Amino acid sequence: MSRNLIVGLDVGTSKICTVVAEVNLNDQLEIVGIGTSISRGVRKGVLINIEAALDSISNSIEAAELISGCDITSLSVSMSGSSVEGTNSRGVVAINSKTREINEEDVERVIEAAKAIVIPMDREILHVIPQEFIVDGIPHIKNPIDMMGIRLEGEVHIITGSSSSSQNLVRCVNRAGFAVDEVVLGSLASSYATLSKEEREMGVLFIDMGKGTTDIILYIDGSPYYTGVIPIGVNRVTLDIAQVWKVPEDVAENIKITAGIAHPSILESQMETVIIPNLGTRPPQEKSRKELSVIINSRLREIFEMMKAEILKRGLYNKINGGIVLTGGGALFPGISNLIEEVFNYPARIGLPMSINGIGEEHIDPKFSSALGLVLYKHEQQKFNKLKKVSSKVKRKNKISSKLKGWFLKEWF
């Protein structure tokens, strides 16, 4: 019997990660292989050199195949970059049935109506995510199926991205010998791996801070209402250290990883030092770790202040009742939660990927949130599509079962 595999490929600026998961007979997900490689040909989340990226992608997938013992044929791939944007839209349809009872087809029609927005020729729709429905003027409805009405409105969040970026990504994976099932927004995948349903319902600001970009999703009442990208990531911190302390970038990166902290308040002693190794004829130098923390804190604070300004501009700042969750490589800075709480005045936590069968401790790390989120996202989608097929058969004999309606409510919305 063939294995039911789900494969996610996270194409980041610092690393490429492939996750292979198997769906067992109990419909549970189990991680069977993870392969990583150094990312080349990718800048700020966008492919800039297909040949270089092709090698990195191939190496990551081959490593995952070797560990899992599987032959990968197709996969879902993450996309990020400053071209990604989110917008909210509304659609309206009339309920045409004699009974005025709203069914799945009506929901699909209103979502299609909401999707009918004008987007530039160089952009494409990545995701359309329902937020709420309004039946005859009654708002805040999550699942309108089986309700009575004559007018159905649907509000959705539409995420778009650069067509050329998406096409180049797909082309690169195809050239490596693999089919692409879907292009998924990387931060959306990460949120699947790290956020609880309660946080999404309460309203949570989700931040995925990578090497090249910082991606944001603001969830309200369980759905995204704002998606944005700040084209600055933790690599900018490395460049700041290199510039201020006049060291090569690789030395600055090592200093950042081994001694960097995001908030001076967590220093055990103000006298702590950092040793800069000898460079050519220049002897080793001793620098203040507090000075290092100030360099890092300044850049990270700037990024978070930019985020805060965007959310304030949209009038959504008072909706973050569930706090702030940070994941990605930027979440590894000690003290970064302190800084976020200082800037936003909301509680903050580090978002670790949820535990999945087969996952090793070394992969329960913010750096792997997007890759693991891809397989979780596709698994939920797979379960939903399976139940929709069952639902179609059930409807021919009866109304949609309460079990299916509950699934519809829980997983789609």
From Swiss-Prot:
Self-interacts. Interacts with FtsZ. GO terms for cellular component: cell division site; cytoplasmic side of plasma membrane. HAMAP family: FtsA. GO terms for biological process: FtsZ-dependent cytokinesis. The lineage of its organism: Bacteria, Pseudomonadati, Spirochaetota, Spirochaetia, Spirochaetales. InterPro entries: ATPase_NBD, Cell_div_FtsA, FtsA/MreB, SHS2_FtsA. Disulfide bonds: none annotated. It is found in: Cell inner membrane. Cell division protein that is involved in the assembly of the Z ring. May serve as a membrane anchor for the Z ring. It comes from the Bacteria. Its main location: membrane. This is Cell division protein FtsA.
